[in-house]
């Protein structure tokens, strides 16, 4: 093998650099129209610097020496794989060239640092000691990069629209990659038979529809960045050799990711399964039946509060729905006649025991609606705590009389019957009668005046006292009432007339 003669190396290098710059400017303008990410500017500058360094290194390859350079593959991310090249002579600027080569001589863009070890398949290519082969490979690689960069502006985004998400953690091991795409789209530039991009427009519309659906369901950005990578599912082909557009074999086999937009919607439900909300059912409420002590007929039952569930990794996405009512389970059957109250614990204070004595006169805590005082025996423990709106709280204190009243005025009037006091005197001339109650005095005054203020609404008769009018009204009601035997006869007549129209029975008159 021999080194081919290059006519005008400076002119060829200038032409290559100008082509690269023009393609980069055109791609930037295309990316600004597509509103892609601005992270690609640094990648473009690295690509230009790498090509310039490779061109200058190819011209300096006439000097023979041992140089450790980084291989021209994205597989080497930290200088793990090195290539030994023999040169003729050494130059004084070897350290600077070695530093520039170790930092810049890699195929753009540089592979990310956060990669999975399982996806690496580094194979160190062994290059011969011939100077011609080394220079030819470098120049041909630079030409391939220049053509790929210029063709990136023409092709644009072939498959899918870029998604503004975090960078893809998958390892891209192709030699030449679309730098016009977003970092999340891991597309190799070289077309392989497994990459199904013929109907990319349909996949793009489907993906946009999926993203609108996911925005409606309020998925977080972390879900989009980890589960919705645009190259899902990826088919890995290990150990394959990539072919350039001129039929040359690249000496770095790696794992090639081929994209399939058709399988995206089949893979989406499997990726979004870890965040499915789990509804925890409400625990049932148990009623503990406490044994009844004594002669009480009330069975206390307390509701146990439900146990607090510790919130772990399960976090529902959607809003919580209305909780289902908690079922209440009661243990044994309650005997007939007993009363069971389901109350919160501590709502009712324990009843205080009552003393076994006779209620004194004037006591305000007597049994409700009692016509007379009630004697509590020693067998009864307490008085039932029942609240009534009206109570006979006023009891006559005279010995042997246990009458109770609702009002104090009624009790005072009753006490006058025991004492014989008559504070109300008749003011009529020649009348010295006295009365214990004011209503009795008013009634007596009507006997002097002859006033009859109570009138019957039926027959307009007047009465001096209201009780006389009540008795008279009952008389009117009894005269209008039909006797029982007449009602029965009338009922029989109606039944007979309904059965036979020519019935000889004649209806009796309504009143005799």
From Swiss-Prot:
Tissues expressing the protein: Ubiquitous. Higher expression in erythroid cells.
A Gene Ontology BP annotation from the UniProt entry:
negative regulation of transcription by RNA polymerase II
Instruction: Tell me the compartments it is located in.
Output: Nucleus
Family annotation (CDD domains): KLF11_N
| Keyword Zinc among UniProt keywords | yes
Q: What is the effect of changing residue 62 to R?
A: High frequency in individuals with diabetes mellitus type 2; increased repression activity; increased binding to SIN3A; impairs activation of insulin promoter
- Molecular function via GO: DNA-binding transcription factor activity; DNA-binding transcription factor activity, RNA polymerase II-specific; RNA polymerase II cis-regulatory region sequence-specific DNA binding; sequence-specific double-stranded DNA binding; transcription cis-regulatory region binding; zinc ion binding
Name of this chain's protein: Krueppel-like factor 11
Q: Which organism is it from?
A: Homo sapiens
């Amino acid at each position: 093998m021999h080194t081919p003669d290059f006519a005008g190396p400076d002119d060829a290098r200038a032409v290559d650099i100008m082509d690269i710059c023009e393609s980069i400017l055109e791609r930037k303008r295309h990316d600004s129209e597509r509103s892609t990410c601005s992270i690609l500017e640094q990648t473009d500058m690295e690509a230009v610097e790498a090509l310039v360094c490779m061109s200058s290194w190819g011209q300096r390859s006439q000097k023979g020496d041992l140089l450790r350079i980084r291989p021209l593959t994205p597989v080497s991310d930290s200088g793990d794989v090195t290539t030994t090249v023999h040169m003729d002579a050494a130059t004084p600027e070897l350290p600077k060239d070695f530093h520039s080569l170790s930092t810049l001589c890699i195929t753009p863009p540089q592979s990310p640092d956060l990669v999975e070890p399982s996806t690496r398949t580094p194979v160190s290519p062994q290059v011969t000691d011939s100077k011609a082969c080394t220079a030819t490979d470098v120049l041909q690689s630079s030409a391939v990069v220049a053509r790929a960069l210029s063709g990136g502006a023409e092709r644009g985004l072939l498959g899918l629209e870029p998604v503004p998400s975090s960078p893809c953690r998958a390892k891209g091991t192709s030699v030449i990659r679309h730098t016009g795409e977003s970092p999340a789209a891991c597309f190799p530039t070289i077309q392989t038979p497994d990459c199904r991009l013929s109907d990319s427009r349909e996949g793009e519309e489907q993906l946009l529809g999926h993203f609108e659906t996911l925005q409606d369901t309020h998925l977080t950005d972390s879900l989009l960045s980890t589960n919705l990578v645009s190259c899902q599912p990826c088919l890995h082909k290990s150990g394959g050799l990539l072919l350039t557009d001129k039929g040359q074999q690249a000496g770095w086999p790696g794992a090639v990711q081929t994209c399939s937009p058709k399988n995206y919607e089949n893979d989406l439900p499997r990726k979004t399964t870890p965040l499915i909300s789990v509804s925890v059912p409400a625990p049932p409420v148990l009623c503990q039946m406490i044994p009844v002590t004594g002669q009480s007929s009330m069975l206390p039952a307390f509701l146990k509060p439900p146990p607090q569930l510790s919130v772990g990794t399960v976090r529902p996405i959607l809003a919580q729905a209305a909780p289902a009512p908690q079922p209440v389970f009661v243990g044994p059957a309650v005997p007939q006649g007993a009363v069971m109250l389901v109350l919160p614990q501590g709502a009712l204070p324990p009843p205080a025991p009552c003393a076994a004595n006779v209620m004194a006169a004037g006591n305000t805590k007597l049994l409700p609606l009692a016509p007379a005082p009630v004697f509590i025996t020693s067998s009864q423990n307490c008085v039932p705590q029942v609240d009534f709106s009206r109570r006979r709280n006023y009891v006559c204190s005279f010995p042997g009389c246990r009458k109770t009243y609702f009002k104090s005025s009624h009790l005072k009037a009753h006490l006058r019957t025991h004492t014989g006091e008559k504070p109300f005197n008749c003011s009529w001339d020649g009348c010295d009668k006295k009365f214990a109650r004011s209503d009795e005095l008013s009634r007596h005054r009507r006997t002097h005046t002859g006033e009859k203020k109570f009138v019957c609404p039926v027959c307009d008769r007047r009465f001096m006292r209201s009780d006389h009018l009540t008795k008279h009204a009952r008389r009117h009601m009894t005269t209008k009432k039909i006797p029982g035997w007449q009602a029965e006869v009338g009922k029989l007549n109606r039944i007979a007339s309904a059965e036979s129209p020519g019935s000889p029975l004649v209806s009796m008159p309504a009143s005799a």
